[in-house]
């Protein structure tokens, strides 16, 4: 009953107790996560588009879609280079919503994450871009809906989570990148951080994942209760070390070595690219 009420009022996206289908549908197969080379290639190809910040937060930090769309500037500390994941966009916000009155709590406990050397310029760029959009709206006499969102439409209103999911695959197709779902950026971040550091506990803390959950995600099996007892606290600096290892690998990666996408059927030249589709 409690889960049903939480689902009804959009505090959670699904009622896990009622879900009987596998997470990945009929094939029950997760697409291969992107390599650091592919992550860098994707970052370069979405530079300057509405996808830039979602890819940074999803691909480098493994944030959930609703956490990305619900991140607000009040929870970003650019002076101390940290940000708090303490809320998320409510589930199924109507497409034409302009103002978010109240955010939903995150799926897991809130967490503080470091803004790395690689990520910092993207936060600054995003902030400056939104300031310019706000000023332009004032000059044009158009409304600007200041929801304080890090990721938003040009008029400040929230981006629909369903739009992100439905258009991400089309974006990758347009960019000649291997197909993954947007949520697989989270799996990409988890896999790369773990492969580079072996520290699955801290990886779980970065992702806001339960210890058992991150173990399942990475295909690990052990006594998680015993591990939890030994590692009851992960300092921010350790999170930074793990993130720096991954972000450093992405920074040094050669995007030319990224795996080529599979050949695709020819598309109509008149068809709009997903990156050009209006939000």
PLM regions and their residue ranges:
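N-terminal core-binding DNA-recognition domain of tyrosine site-specific recombinases/integrases
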Residues: 1-13, 28, 157-163, 178-184, ...
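Basic, Lys/Arg- and aromatic-enriched nucleic-acid-binding interface segment
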Residues: 8, 12-71, 79, 110, ...
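C-terminal secondary-structure termini that scaffold catalytic or DNA-interacting sites
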Residues: 80, 91-110, 117-119, 129-132, ...
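Non-catalytic DNA-binding core/recognition domains of DNA-processing enzymes
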Residues: 1-5, 20, 115
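Short, polar N-cap/turn motifs at the start of nucleic acid-interacting alpha helices
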Residues: 75-82, 198-229
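C-terminal catalytic core of tyrosine-transesterase DNA break-rejoin enzymes
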Residues: 8, 56, 60, 67, ...
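Active-site/catalytic core of tyrosine-dependent DNA strand-transfer enzymes
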Residues: 88-91, 115-177
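Hydrophobic alpha-helix feature that most strongly marks membrane-spanning transmembrane helices
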Residues: 47, 127-131, 169, 173-176, ...
């Amino acid at each position: 009953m409690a889960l049903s009420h939480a689902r009804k009022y959009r505090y959670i996206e699904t009622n896990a107790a009622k879900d009987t289908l596998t997470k990945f549908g009929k094939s029950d197969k997760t697409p291969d996560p992107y390599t650091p080379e592919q992550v860098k290639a994707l970052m370069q190809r979405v530079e300057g588009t509405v996808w830039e910040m979602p890819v940074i937060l999803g691909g480098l930090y493994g944030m959930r879609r609703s956490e990305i769309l619900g991140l607000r500037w009040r929870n970003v500390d650019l002076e101390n280079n940290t940000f708090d994941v303490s809320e998320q966009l409510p589930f199924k916000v109507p497409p034409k919503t302009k103002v978010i009155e109240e955010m939903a709590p995150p799926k897991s406990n809130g967490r503080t994450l470091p803004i790395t050397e690689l990520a910092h310029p993207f936060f600054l760029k995003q902030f400056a871009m939104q300031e310019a959009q706000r000023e332009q709206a004032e000059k044009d006499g158009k409304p600007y809906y200041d929801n304080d969102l890090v990721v938003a439409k040009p008029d400040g209103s929230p981006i629909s989570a369903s739009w992100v999911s439905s258009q991400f695959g089309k974006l990758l197709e347009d960019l000649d990148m291997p197909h993954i779902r947007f949520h697989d950026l989270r799996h990409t971040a988890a896999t790369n951080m773990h492969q580079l550091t072996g520290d699955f506990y801290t990886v779980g803390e970065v992702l806001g994942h339960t210890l058992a959950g991150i173990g399942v995600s990475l295909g690990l099996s052990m006594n998680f209760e015993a591990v939890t007892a030994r590692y009851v606290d992960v300092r921010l600096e350790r999170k930074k070390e793990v993130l720096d290892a991954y972000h450093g690998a992405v920074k040094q990666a050669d995007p030319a070595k990224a795996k080529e996408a599979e050949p695709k059927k020819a598309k109509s030249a008149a068809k709009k690219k997903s990156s050009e589709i209006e939000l």
